[in-house]
Amino acid sequence: MSLKTPKGTTDLNPDDALVYEDLIDRTKNIFKLHGAVPIDTPVFELKSILLNKYGEDTKLIYDLKNNGGEECALRYDLTVPFSRYMSMNKLKKIKRYQIGKVYRRDQPSVVQGRWREFLQADFDIAGESLPMMADSELVCCMNRLLKTYNIGDFVIRVSDKRILYGIFEVCEIPNNLFATVSSSIDKLDKIAVNDINKELKLKGLTDKQIINLNIYIQKSGTVDVLDFLRENDVYKKCSEAVDDLCKLYEYCKIMKCSDHLIIDLSLARGLDYYTGMIIEGKYLNKNIGSVAGGGRYDNLIGSLENSSYTNTYNVPCAGFSIGLSRIFSCIQKPKVNTNVKVFISASGKLLLEERLKIQSILWEANISLETFYNKRNNPGEHKKYCVKHGIKYLIVVKEEQYNKGFVTVIEVNTNLENVIMIDNLPSHLQ
């Protein structure tokens, strides 16, 4: 039998797990800064709730074996479970965050940061609000997150699904091709436009439709794109959406989060439940695709199957997901790979009881520490261990010193030794 993890999954060693912990903490802090509260939902959901929500990606849902009970599937994202939670609890307003693993039966690619099991962090604003205020806060929150990870320069691309519908109408592309053509357009930042055009041709578009479509989907910028739309025939089809993006851009300027913002008409996120603004965050010069994405989904809660409140209960929502597994793959791993501050050793004898008493004193003072419970002590080896794992202090317990109420404390990086009274250890080490 071959011992390995399933394809598209990975273990985390202690070093990587500590980096993940720090990444999660930094993400939570930004969400809390924006006033979000945490929720949690099951890793698997009723299959009927997940179906028909993800467009062409529905095929990537992991079904669970039916053992004579409910038909279930692993969650594909955190948005649909959140909407189910809202509907079940008849909530009208919440600003929430959730961090958890999601599952997709995709073709994995470590280089491109694509896994079958990966960690996502979601931020959502549910409830009535002034037009584009919640959407603008999404941009602000995403902007702050991508800055705090300190990976490099990035862009936040926005558009609106209603503008896409307007473009398709002007280009005379039938509605039944919306999903498949949108999925091709969304690849424009990864694939050359000529290859996209060939793909569109294979999907049934005429040369005229492709030429007209290219006039729009190659437009990206800021106010210049909005001006272009206002002066174009498409404005009659989606004037509200264009005006909403104008508000979004102005609000983001006021909140000082427009420095990385781009209005990009090729943005066409494929999930069926988006109804308005769509958003995507991407680091430049990183071959991992987008690291964050989302948008407005005003009808998802009301559309859930088997909901007692369908057609009578609905809540407007906007939110985004950030792929922490992709972020992790870009982070420069720090040399310090432990959160332990102190190692307790002994010289000459085992001195187990003495070490345990010191251990108890330091734990009471909330000082993280480590000691070995084996049959031999070697302070020299323990110091090497401290250097390797980034532990700041080495305490060496010596019988004669201990009986007088003292121990030796070594600062590992400087080799500076101090004899410290045991009662003063917490204040010395903090």
Swiss-Prot record:
This is Probable histidine--tRNA ligase, cytoplasmic. It comes from the Eukaryota. The keyword Acetylation does not apply. Keywords: Aminoacyl-tRNA synthetase, ATP-binding, Cytoplasm, Ligase, Nucleotide-binding, Protein biosynthesis. GO terms for cellular component: cytosol; mitochondrion. It is an enzyme of class 6 (ligase). Its main location: cytoplasm. GO terms for molecular function: ATP binding; histidine-tRNA ligase activity; RNA binding. GO terms for biological process: histidyl-tRNA aminoacylation; mitochondrial translation. It catalyses: tRNA(His) + L-histidine + ATP = L-histidyl-tRNA(His) + AMP + diphosphate + H(+). SUPFAM superfamilies: Class II aaRS ABD-related, Class II aaRS and biotin synthetases. It is found in: Cytoplasm. Its EC number is 6.1.1.21. Belongs to the class-II aminoacyl-tRNA synthetase family. CDD domains: HisRS-like_core (cd00773).
